[in-house]
Amino acid sequence: MKKNISKKSIILTLTMAATLVVAALLAWWLWPKNYEEMIPAQAKAVVRIQPAKLQKEVGNIPNPLKSVLGIEANGIDFSQPLYAFVTPNEYIGFVAKVENEEAIETQINKLVAQKQCQPTEEYDNLHWTWLSSGWLMAWNSRMAMALGPGVAQEKDMLRQTITSMVNSSDCFTKTAAYNQLKKQEGSIQLFAQLDAMPTPYNMLFRLSVPADCDPATIQVFASAQINKDSTIINSQITSENEDIVNAINAFEKEKGCIRIANPALCDSTLFVMATSTQGKQLLQLLKTDATLRGLLMGLNQTIDADRMLGSTQGVFTMEISTFAKDWTPTFCLKAETSANNLFADANYWMESAKKQKNVVLKRTSADAFFLSNDKQQLNFGKNATNNALYFTSPSLINRAAQPFIAQKSNKPQGTLVYFHVNLNKLFAQPCMNDGAMKNILKTILPGSHAITYKAETGRKASIIIKD
């Protein structure tokens, strides 16, 4: 005989089920976030440091918090990864798992006494302090985060950004980029959108991709291998858009490879860059940087720099021998060109120069010129010996006639872009005396003597930092 289920029992059962669902949702919503979940999904760059692996490689655990923020890492759980990231509004963030909240509080109190940070405030279930180094720090028993650098007037914006990250359910750990990042080998793993790197620094990567590709759609994944006398960073350039990937692959084949013909000169020069390029692509890329765009606009008021650079096709190199105190370089830029009559309008240029204040343009030979204004002096022309269009500082005019430091390679695979910096020479330049840039480089490259970057076919790149 079947039992009749009363209406009251049905209502009670449904009520209990609904209560359980609501409780589960509330628990999910209110459950404390993992420290890794503080990183926003739209982060433009993320660096993942695994201290345990790093200690095995180098014998100790570097303290990025000390070198960047000016604080010790007391209370941080070094058994778990540390993260640095770039927020969508382009602040730099650090986040780590907390092992001992009291140790952090003790350290902050000492800094307050030393007037290196402001007294701690508490709200939104977080402790907050403003570090004199320009960082806003927030922490609790689970995580410690710092965001900056900024000035005191930016504290409200930094606070809003941290609060938004804490309260958001949209985090980097739920993205495909995070899964790809974790697959990278090494103790230090990196993800970055190409637009997270400011111009002109991202040009090293952009020289190996089509100029019309949106940098925001291009991703770089990398890992660092730390050896006894060098650090090697291997990276892969890719995109979530398959059309972009196909465009980069096609561009590599069209661009062609180079080989370095004079390694000794590269090692002894402050700065060397070499690649193979087509003029229109090069010109389009140079104009993405405001400083270079302004420089070209200034030159175009007197000469047709756009036409000259647009005519190039083949090897393109740049050498810098010195930087002045204001970072003005002594340089030699050369590019292969087969174009004739590049200077057919030279007489018009010289007449135009006469109408401009403090501008002098002289023709020193059929295909050679000297240009000066109140900011710079420049030799430019075409050398028949090596078919090189050149723009050079007067003191490096002899380099214009010398063979290119790189040559085209007939191999289908190899180097697309080469870049070398002699750090010993860089640190000796007058522009490094004031300390700001020197301190940054000394902090991130302690004891290093040279940096070499190579972009390779297959959307790969490597950075070698020699100690």
Where are these regions (language model features)?
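Primarily extracytoplasmic ectodomains and periplasmic/lumenal surface modules that are beta-strand-rich
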Residues: 52-56, 90-92, 101-103, 279-282
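N-terminal Sec-pathway targeting helices
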Residues: 2-20
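Short amphipathic beta-strand starts and helix->beta connectors
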Residues: 30-33, 73-82, 216-220, 254-259, ...
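Membrane-interface motif at the C-terminal end of an N-terminal transmembrane signal
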Residues: 21-40
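Leucine-rich, highly hydrophobic segment in Treponema pallidum outer-membrane-associated proteins
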Residues: 16-23, 165-275, 420-467
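Short extracytoplasmic
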Residues: 48-70
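Extended non-catalytic domains of envelope/secretory-pathway proteins
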Residues: 252-253, 259-326, 336-343
